[in-house]
């Protein structure tokens, strides 16, 4: 066959002998080769243009794109794996510019998790995650809160949270209840947040999550599991009272802090059924964390007394679960539970009264923020 009888497989033109190109088993003219194929910037293999990966700056074959490159989580730019930056204990990739901004940013990424610093004494420590909204996801605003809370040492940090429309999450290092009340200046932090137009209760997005150290719940894993089973049983048994305490709407609870709905005659059976459901972390008592048990029950608040009352309630539940037997916990009525609360937990008692949850005594209810 003569060269002048060869046909371009793409456009059908008769091929000139000096401009015949073969690619992927097909003969092509030079114009079609340029229009329909490209060369991978990484391995320099030619590929069909329609199969090319990459971005406006890089052209890659599928293999190089999958195994040699990744995408910056923050800005979406394509980066080589060797050029990606990661925060500690995190597998989310960033380009250098975004990584530097994150390191300098007052609002850290959602996956940011520094080594915990424990404040206070005793065995029971509580870390809080408080979501605030409506005031903007502004580093300057976060810095103002950090300056108030972290005068001498880092006690809180701020994080991005995709569930929040126009704000961020305040996270504390683990603290004893006494430290939260008497040493941590939460009232000043909340007042400043409100002054910057943030809200927590008066939103459709915000929650207050309280983490309790698992190590305080028993001397070994078996004892800790027994204590956790009593916690889950208590929450299931007294669900109606706790929902009223939480201030969450039914829809909000179902989405962010669902009930296990596994109440049985014993705490162990209730706990087993709860775990068997595999509901993940969006449940009232989240069991997914290795080092903590997370209470996700509460709606967010920037009212100091409500915040402290929630901490005191979690502390009371945990102490009952640690110190009581299964039988004692299973027989504990709500009225007996609230009557156990010592007068020093004044915020909790006042809040229970305001919600008509304290032996029928009523206290005037204050406005939430």
Model-found features: residue ranges?
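Zinc-coordinating Cys/His ligand positions in small cysteine/histidine-rich zinc-finger domains
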Residues: 16, 28-32, 48-49, 58-69, ...
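Short Cys/His-rich "knuckle" micro-motifs
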Residues: 18-21, 39, 50-53, 71, ...
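Terminal catalytic/cofactor-binding subdomain
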Residues: 93-197
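Aromatic/basic-lined ligand-recognition segments
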Residues: 127, 225-301
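Histidine-centered divalent-metal-coordination microenvironment in nucleic-acid enzymes
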Residues: 165-169, 201-217, 292-296
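Helical (often loop-to-helix) elements that flank the catalytic cores of nucleotide-handling enzymes
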Residues: 179-190, 216-246, 303-318, 351-365, ...
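Flexible helix-coil linker/hinge segments at domain or subdomain boundaries
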Residues: 201, 240-254, 319-350
């Amino acid at each position: 066959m003569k060269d002048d009888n060869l046909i371009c497989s793409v456009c059908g033109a008769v091929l000139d002998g000096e401009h015949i190109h073969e690619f992927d088993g097909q003969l092509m003219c030079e114009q079609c080769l340029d229009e329909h194929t490209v060369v991978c910037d990484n391995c320099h293999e030619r590929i069909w243009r329609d199969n090319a990966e990459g971005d406006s700056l890089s052209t890659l074959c599928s293999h190089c794109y999958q195994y040699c490159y990744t995408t910056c989580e923050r800005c979406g730019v394509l980066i080589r794996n060797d050029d990606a930056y990661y925060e500690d204990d995190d597998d989310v990739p960033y380009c250098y510019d975004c990584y530097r901004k994150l390191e300098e940013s007052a609002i850290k990424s959602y996956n940011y998790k520094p080594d915990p610093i424990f404040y206070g004494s005793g065995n029971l420590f509580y870390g809080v995650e408080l979501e605030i909204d409506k005031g903007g996801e502004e580093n300057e605003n976060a810095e103002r809160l950090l300056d108030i809370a972290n005068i001498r040492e880092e006690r809180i940090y701020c994080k991005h949270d995709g569930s929040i429309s126009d704000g961020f999450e305040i996270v504390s290092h683990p603290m004893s209840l006494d430290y939260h009340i008497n040493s941590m200046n939460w009232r000043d932090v909340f007042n400043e947040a409100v002054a910057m137009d943030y809200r927590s209760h008066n939103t459709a997005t915000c929650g207050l999550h309280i983490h309790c150290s698992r190590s305080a719940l028993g001397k070994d894993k078996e004892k800790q599991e027994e204590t956790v089973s009593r916690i889950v049983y208590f929450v299931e048994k007294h669900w109606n009272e706790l929902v009223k305490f939480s201030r969450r709407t039914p829809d909000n609870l179902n989405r962010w802090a669902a009930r296990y709905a596994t109440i049985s005659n014993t705490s162990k059976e209730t706990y087993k059924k709860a775990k068997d459901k595999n509901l993940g972390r969006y449940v009232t008592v989240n069991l997914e964390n290795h080092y903590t048990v997370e209470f996700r029950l509460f709606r967010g608040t920037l009212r100091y007394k409500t915040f402290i009352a929630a901490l005191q309630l979690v502390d009371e539940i945990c102490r009952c679960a640690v110190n009581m037997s299964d039988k004692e916990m299973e027989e504990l009525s709500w009225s007996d539970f609230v009557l156990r609360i010592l007068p020093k937990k004044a915020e909790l008692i006042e809040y229970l009264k305001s919600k008509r949850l304290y032996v029928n005594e009523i206290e005037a209810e204050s406005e939430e923020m």
